[in-house]
Amino acid sequence: MSTLYTMVAPCFFGTESTLNFEVKRLGAQNIQVTDGRVAFQGGADVIAAANLNLRTAERVLLLLATYKATTFDELFDGCYNIAWEDLLPANAAFPVKGSSLSSQLSSVPACQSIVKKAIVKRLMHGHKVGTLPEDGALYKVRFALRKDTVEIYLDTSGDGLHKRGYRKNATLAPIKETLAAAIADLGRVRRDSLVQDPFCGSGTLVIEAAQKALNLAPGLRRRFAAEHFDFVPADIWAEQRQKALDEVRKDAAFEGIGYDIDPAAVALANANAKLAGVGDRCRFEVADVRKDRKSTRLNSSHTVVSR
């Protein structure tokens, strides 16, 4: 029987319903929606599928423990009780980051040190070694203290999920890819939609809308931290990547158009669309929609204006 993991996917406030629907599509179990996050359970296949497919999640975290801690001893003991040796190899590199809010243990650096010491002691005991070289794969550990309750996480994503791999450069103040994806969903973008952005910048809104319309998984062009985790085997990643490729809607009639007064931004948007795999569904043009409405298609009855 496969191990059932508890996962937490943070998201922008107000986009929880969109992320909830995405998680349901993965076949996850025991889904719980709270402000700014969606928690769910699944096997190693769901870890891979979530990272590859979730458009509006900021990252996918494994929730390893939840417990009360008002002293450093309680913080240490709760962390030590996690079976770290089943998750991390003896040579794992495991930096620790965290936060504390409205808790008696308010010093984040001190808490980081305690969590790190607990993991070190448990790994040395579990692997029966005297030293931990930390020269292997990277396992990012996170903790969150909220009102004296600790949550310990293992980050399966690595870089945030907004980093799709297609936006090598951006204009000033670009919209985050995960937020753009949520806007596309809330705007009810479909496979036959015509989406236009009159102030496209580097093209993120149109590109995310195109990927949604084509059901093109956002994570196909990048790698994830959990691809190096022993408990998420390579064959699971290969299977989930192939599944995502098989589900692309190649017959979608989507069309995306973006306008901007900056030629450099338009060139960048076209380049990003090609890198994102939707260059044949999107085009970006230099235009000032305040003056050139007749030369654009902003009055089309099938248009979704993104801003």
Question: Model regions: which residues?
Answer:
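Beta-rich nucleic-acid/ligand-interaction surfaces
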Residues: G136-L145, S202-G203
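Short glycine/proline-rich turn/loop motifs
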Residues: S99-L101, L161-Y166, V248-K250
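Single conserved hydrophobic/aromatic residue that forms the stacking wall/gate
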Residues: L298-R307
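S-adenosyl-L-methionine
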Residues: S2-R25, Q32-V33, V38-T56, S106-P109, ...
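Non-catalytic nucleic-acid substrate-recognition regions in nucleic-acid-modifying enzymes
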Residues: S2-Y139
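Short conserved loop adjoining the S-adenosyl-L-methionine
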Residues: K291-S295
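Short alpha-helical
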Residues: G14, P263-A264, V304
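Conserved S-adenosyl-L-methionine
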Residues: I175-R290
